[in-house]
């Protein structure tokens, strides 16, 4: 419902992991292995992104399936059923394909891509922290997604905790807050030359 678009559950811990875009898959694999998650629902922005990520997980023997609009209804139902029955560890989904997914006791929801529409964040993570259980909403954020992250924080009226993962510290830093001067993009390196040539 529209009234709940900016509400997130009290039982959800939110974590932002700043990381360079090119290393997102590597970081996700590291988290899955080190945190020993039983299962997790992972959101990507595009169908192609969902397929690509699922193949990367398969390569390192993480049992996963992808669901999106290009999959047949039958394929989607089978993947969902396998996930509900603990036959697969990771379900990679797009926002559209995930509509109507009802999985009880989902401990982790991971935003591999920051949603372009802030209220989709609320819908995505609403699948964890149910029934009195604690849940985790983990978002991998690259520097170019900072504006989208700020939109989410404004919507839910909450500053989300940034946690850098050792070995995955980003070259392009995700700022804590908007800079008054847009030229200072707060990067360690990579944007310096371009910034010098920009006027305002």
What residue spans do the PLM features occupy?
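Conserved helicase RecA-like core
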Residues: 1-173
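Intrinsically disordered, Lys/Arg-rich low-complexity segments
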Residues: 173-200
